[in-house]
Amino acid sequence: RGAAWGAKFAFSSIPDTSETMLYNLLVTHHNVGARDHTNSWGDDSTTAYTARCRAIDRFSWDFEDSMVAFAITNLTSQVRTPENAKSALAVSATLNAPNQSTNASFGGQGPTSDQRRKPEVHAPGDAIPSTGTGSTTATAVMGGTSMACPAAAASGTLIRQFLKEGRIHDGNPNANFVINPSGALIRAMLMTSAVDMAGGCGYPSNREGFSRAFVAHVLALPCG
């Protein structure tokens, strides 16, 4: 059913990717209640900090309660844009369960062109059941960082729910622990939750980032 299967969502196509368009699109989604923004698109032609990156960082500054996640490039070289925005949660992919502790064969790595660590986290993104084409009920099995990013963003949504309902102490609602989290806090808790993956050079690193997000490390999740 997905990581945050009870959540509501808003979605839009991307008619162009100018700074103004991207900023305004994020604001539009914020205005209808969206707080965790997942994006499975990018520009593989450059590693530079671009106007799109500026739009993400400006939005994250202006709307501090929002968290913006981006799938990193599937190329196995340096991360591209706009996942290299300072405030973006850049997401790479692992294999699917039961091999979720293994890096997928695709996905870029840091550092960014200005020497910041990316990606931040990994999530399952290989052999993922998804919607297909041809009919309204079609399904397909797909792979890519585009599949991993929604899983990481949904994990952030679960963290947000626990914080807003005061569940962070023991998993039960408690008004004494209710907070309205910032996007930066959601991002930080996802990174803090991470567990090391098999092989590779360990974490944190330019290949793994802070490694695979695992929200059970920061949330008192119910059993079963």
Locations of the language-model features?
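Subtilisin-like serine protease catalytic core
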Residues: 1-21, 32-36, 45-49, 62-65, ...
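Active-site neighborhood of phospho(di)ester-bond hydrolases with catalytic His/Asp-centered motifs
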Residues: 38-40, 68-73, 91
